[in-house]
Amino acid sequence: MFAKRGYEATSVEEIAEHANISKPIIYEHFGGKEGLYAVVVDREMEYVVRRIAEAIATGSPRQRVERSTLAFLTYVRDHPDGFAVMAHGAPAAAATGGMSSLLNDVAERVGDVFTAAFKGAGYDPKAAPIYAHALIGMVTSVGQWWTEAHKPSVEEVAKHVAALAWMGLRHLPKHPTLAANT
């Protein structure tokens, strides 16, 4: 219900009716709409973070970029309601997470992978969080676009996004500059 109508437009009465339970049961188990929403968001976050963590656990840097991109976009395709709840959330107090928390969690994990790779390649590891957040932001934005477009296939989109990310990372200068300043 949250995915279809949004947090604000969904009432406890509607949730109870849809679940074929009484309102007091919702209040007893979740404390109200905010508590239920928090459980839904936390469940979705746990699922998508686990999928991405599995995707980046092993493999070459390129494989990790490709697999994590495909894992997230597959989540968007296969769990549209969960993605909608996180992407078009509720008041910040309603959940312990939400899209911002998800992005930070995933970016931290990707940043750890980048930090190790940067150290091994002679790059400044302090820059790793910048690149991790940039990559996560790009993939998330494309995921939001895809929820409206529904084409091309998630696999096709993942190939293009991963190629852009990989080519950028592969040709990353050790000391980036702005062309306007040269």
What are these regions (language model features)?
Residues 73-97, 108-115, 144-148:
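Amphipathic alpha-helical segments used for helix-helix packing
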Residues 39, 53-78, 135, 158:
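Hydrophobic alpha-helical connector segments
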Residues 46-49, 95-119, 129-134, 156-159, ...:
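Amphipathic alpha-helical packing segments from all-alpha helical-bundle domains
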Residues 1-35, 39:
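Helix-turn-helix
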Residues 4-8, 79, 121:
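Short coil/turn segments at alpha/beta junctions that flank glycine-rich nucleotide-binding fingerprints
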Residues 172-182:
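C-terminal effector-binding regulatory domain of bacterial HTH transcription factors
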